[in-house]
Swiss-Prot record:
GO terms for cellular component: cytoplasm. Belongs to the purine/pyrimidine phosphoribosyltransferase family. Archaeal HPRT subfamily. Pfam families: Pribosyltran. HAMAP family: Hypx_phosphoribosyltr (MF_01467). Pathway: Purine metabolism; IMP biosynthesis via salvage pathway; IMP from hypoxanthine: step 1/1. Its EC number is 2.4.2.8. This is Hypoxanthine/guanine phosphoribosyltransferase. It comes from the Archaea. The keyword Aminoacyl-tRNA synthetase does not apply. It is found in: Cytoplasm. Disulfide bonds: none annotated.
């Protein structure tokens, strides 16, 4: 059984302007986050990732439940790149631009030489991932692996082109005729 694919195929689509947004528990936290789905996603990420790491890194907000679940399974701590400053010593700000927003992300709690796994809910334009990578490089961290649950658009290619890193994903989708299609 593949709960991730099953729930994607049946998730609602909302049109905003010319863009079709899929509304799914992994990417939006609504309509309902199923614990079985979260466990499935976390175990699949663990299986395909280099887990010789010191920390799991994600961006707020929807990467948080994924990173938390992986942390609970592995006893590896996680760090959240936040959208607001905390003004802690060593805080690293980085500019983020996606297809629908821009702003700053702030990294705390990652040290030079830390081996990290980056996880996130979705990659579409690659803007968030490029920002995370830049902040981690500035911190002197060693990025061991990058995994996003859902791939939509050309974000993987953008990340590879701009940073040299490959991004693994669990499922690639598109929205066609008002429905999610697994590619």
């Amino acid at each position: 059984m593949n709960l991730l694919e099953d729930t994607l195929k049946s998730c609602p689509i909302v049109k905003r302007g010319e863009y079709n947004y899929f509304i799914h528990p992994i990417t939006d936290g609504v309509p309902l986050m199923n614990s079985q789905l979260l466990r499935e996603v976390a175990t699949k990420i663990i299986k395909i990732s280099d887990m010789d790491i010191d920390k799991i890194v994600t961006a707020e907000a929807m990467g948080i439940p994924i990173a938390t679940t992986i942390s609970l399974y592995t006893d590896i701590p996680y760090v959240i790149m936040r959208k607001r400053k905390y003004l802690l010593e060593g805080e690293i700000p980085v500019h983020q631009e996606t297809g629908y927003s821009k702003g700053e992300l702030y990294l705390n709690g990652v040290n030079k030489g830390d081996k990290v796994l980056i996880v996130d809910d979705v990659i579409s334009t690659g803007g968030t991932m490029v920002a995370i990578i830049k902040a981690l490089e500035k911190a002197g961290a060693h990025i061991k692996d990058i995994v996003c649950v859902i791939e939509r658009g050309n974000g993987k290619e953008e990340v590879k082109e701009k940073t040299g890193y490959d991004v693994k994903t669990l499922v690639k989708i598109d929205v066609v005729n008002g429905k999610v299609v697994i590619l």
